[in-house]
Amino acid sequence: MSPSRLIEMKNTKVRLHGFEWPPSCMQVVSWVGAILLVVAYALAVASIVQDADTFSLVALGLLSFVYLVAVVCMVIYTYRVTASDPSDPTVALERSHHLQPNLVEFNQLDYSYFCDICNTHVLPDTKHCSVCNRCSYSFDHHCVWVGNDIGGENYVDFIRMLTSVFVMLLVQILTLTLQLVIIEAKEQPQSEMKTL
């Protein structure tokens, strides 16, 4: 890294979590997209209820329950991932105690790597995120959808969030398929009457 880039990174504000202002464009897109998905599902359910038979209503009730659970889980896990601070423990400790760099005691064997930007020793699988400008423990990637680094303690919540979104989309597809079946069944007797 060039010396000028190093100075620029040291002078850039550290993002501790994904709720810090301003949100990225992709974060806003994800929030709006999630709201639109829920609204689209509610509209699909409203249109199915009007023409559904008993079996379709039971199926719709089960799908809606699963969808509701998935939405609640998605909101909870998205909040947890976005609000978390996956910083390296030494970096977080120095930041929380406002100590001078390198004054925190650490095990030389565990903290054998040094970050020139954070000016501290870090664990071997810690990487410096150029977007958040912090060293993140067990860094996997920076997620633009939540505006936070993924790794360490928030990795499991990230997988749970993705699973919740997958279940939401799967239920949405199944509900739209049910809607198409109901529409087809409703139109089928009319087409048979025309042939008579």
Regions found by a protein language model. Name each.
Residues M1-L196:
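Intracellular leaflet-associated regions of eukaryotic membrane-associated proteins
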